[in-house]
Structure formats: C-alpha cells, structure tokens
Amino acid sequence: MIKKIFITLVFSLLLVENSYSKESFFDEAKKLFDKEKYEESKFLFQRDIVFNPKKAGSYLYLAKIFKVEENLMEEEKNLKTTLLLDPKNEEAIYLLMDIEIERSNFAKVKELKENFEKVCSKLCPKISSINEKLKNFDTKNES
C-alpha cells in the first residue's frame, strides 16, 4: 500500500514538473527576445511549439525574429500561422499588412485593413500609419 502511494506521488510530481517546464519555454524565450538574443529565443519558441502547437504567441515571436533576420518567407509563414490560430491577433494582421504594402498588394492590404479595424483594441492608432504608407506609395506612383 505504501509502495503504491509512493509511486503515485512520484508520478504526480513528475507530471507537475513536466507541465511547468513546457510553460517556461515561452516565458524564457520571451525574456531572451526582449534582451535581443534572437537565436536563443528562436530555439525556445520552436521548442514551445513542439509542446504547444496551437499557441499563437510563439509563432508571432518567431515572425518578429525572422523580420529582424530579414527572412521574409519565414516571417510571412509564421504570421499566417498566427492568424490561423488566432484570427483576431491585431499585431499579426498589422505586420502582414506591412509585408503586403512592400509588395504593392493593395487588394490584400485593403482586406487586412478592414479586418484590422474590426479587431483592433491596442494598435488602433497604427491605422493612420498604414494610411500614410498607402498615401506615400500613391504619391510616388504619380511622380
């Protein structure tokens, strides 16, 4: 009887410790990202995705890292994955609008902007910067 209780207790402790370590991947990766240690944080965000594949935050931070590394294809892939998991993620929508403006894909920018205006809560002032970028692009084309 004591042996069964001991085994159950040890097993429970291992499960608790394991679930804590999974959660700490994201937290630790975010701390490293804030310190601009992108390679180390990228590795931890990728590990977090292995344990939590439906966590949009890890994909968003990976997209930000790939933006710093100027890897447009990976940045876009991670932003789209973020939006698949969390369609109302305003930061991902905003970053994707930036990419589409650079590509001059104004139909996509318009679609994203409409969606952004519906869901924005923290980044609403960024709409004016998107409008300004669009206006600047139109001015360049007229010249």
Report each predicted region and the residues it spans.
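Canonical positions in the second alpha-helix
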Residues: 48, 81-82, 115-116
